[in-house]
Amino acid sequence: MGRSLKKGPFVDSHLIEKIEKLGAAKKPIKTWSRRSMIIPDFVGHTFLVHNGRTFQSVYVTENMVGHRLGEFAPTRTFKKHGAHTEKASVK
């Protein structure tokens, strides 16, 4: 169930303050707020989004508006599954 339209998108207030303070400067903004929704004011800015261990660089484009910051900073690293070897197929 999604968020009610009358409530509007959730964005942490400190992110909006930082965007307003930066203005035209494109300095990366470090944040732990993966839950914040990307709004049109964020387009063209770079965010450093925490993934639980490190900060992932996320450059915001117009296609990302309406999504959450956390969607673009994966928390799990995929280690490939075991390859089929000749030894396994001999059985």
Curated annotation (Swiss-Prot):
GO terms of biological process kind: ribosomal small subunit assembly; translation
Short name of any one Pfam family annotated for the protein: Ribosomal_S19
Domain of life: Bacteria
Presence of the UniProt keyword Isomerase in the record: no
Residues in coiled coil: none
Any GO MF annotation of the entry: structural constituent of ribosome
Keywords per UniProt: Ribonucleoprotein, Ribosomal protein, RNA-binding, rRNA-binding
InterPro entries reported for this sequence: Ribosomal_uS19 (IPR002222), Ribosomal_uS19_bac-type (IPR005732), Ribosomal_uS19_CS (IPR020934), Ribosomal_uS19_SF (IPR023575)
Keyword Ribosomal protein: yes
GO CC annotation: cytoplasm; small ribosomal subunit
HAMAP family according to UniProt: Ribosomal_uS19
Family: Belongs to the universal ribosomal protein uS19 family.
Chain's role: Protein S19 forms a complex with S13 that binds strongly to the 16S ribosomal RNA.
The name this protein goes by in its record: Small ribosomal subunit protein uS19
Protein encoded by which gene: rpsS
